[in-house]
Amino acid sequence: MTLKNEKRNMIFAGLVIGVIASLLVLFGNPKNMGFCVACFLRDTAGALGLHSAEAVQYIRPEIIGLVFGSFFMALAKKEFSPRGGSAPVTRFVLGMFVMIGSLMFLGCPFRMILRLAGGDLNALLGLAGFACGILVGVFFLNKGYSLKRSYALTKAEGGVFPVLTLAVLALLLAAPAFIHFTEAGNGPGAMHAPIAGLAVGALAQRTRLCMVGGIRDLVLFKETKLILGFAAILVGALVCNLILSGTTGTSYFHLGFADQPIAHTDGLWNFLGMMLTGFACVLLGGCPLRQLILSGEGSSDSAVTVFGLLAGAAFCHNFGLASSAKGPTANGKAAVVVGLVAAVVIASVNTFKKENAK
């Protein structure tokens, strides 16, 4: 496939994903949250009893769909390639910090785009921080940062994460008493939608869509393919929001900083939260969406990162790190600062390749 065709497919996939994300709000998801990998993993962690924040406990079918969409597409295209063994503990810790940064901002990079598409100008500060974090990560990449190579694994090992996802689906359908579900109307965890994740997972697998990769590749290689997907999601969701606002009698686009759904107006911490997320995602090699897609393709490294995201969500809600519409917490601010320092240390320790080669 030529680069021109790849870019065309990326734009098409981004537009479709943006429209799907907007329609999910129409079908019941919270506004500006048709998709949010961080928030949905947080909800799932709560459902599994990893935290006790009652308003955000639900096994999100979108997460299950993303993994299965990637898994089935990878099998169909013979791209299921189990690999792993690259600094698993470091990846777990970085995954936790990605979640801490995301829950400071109240959204992952995917939701950041959707917040912009819904008119939330607070997301502009998040985007600025996200870009700055990526630039810091690119600095270390240029200096030789690497978590070292991964190794080929057995098909059985690569299938563990999809099987675990299947088990979570069984829990969602069976709804046993030990699984926690937000009561209808009590919070975003209850406002669930159909499994659109299958389509998004398949499209993301085929196009290698990554929110971090767009800015990273543009800076490193002057390559625009991934950032076209980023922009296309924004355009697709924005246009769909405007159409829905004009045809349904409900506003899906509200331009401004104040009174935005599931958001706060503290610009500094919106910036720093997404800076941590962007920086840590570069060190991991992909955004939370990309980590889920790679997990479906058989990457145990990405599966470990997803476990880190789940653990980070538990920490955020068990220890008061997560922000709310009222703003960030003191504990959350401290955690973001610790995360930024830890990310710099991890990046520095693992930046040695070019230095040793000199």
How would you label these PLM feature ranges?
Residues M1-K358:
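Membrane-interfacial helix-loop segments of redox and metal-homeostasis proteins
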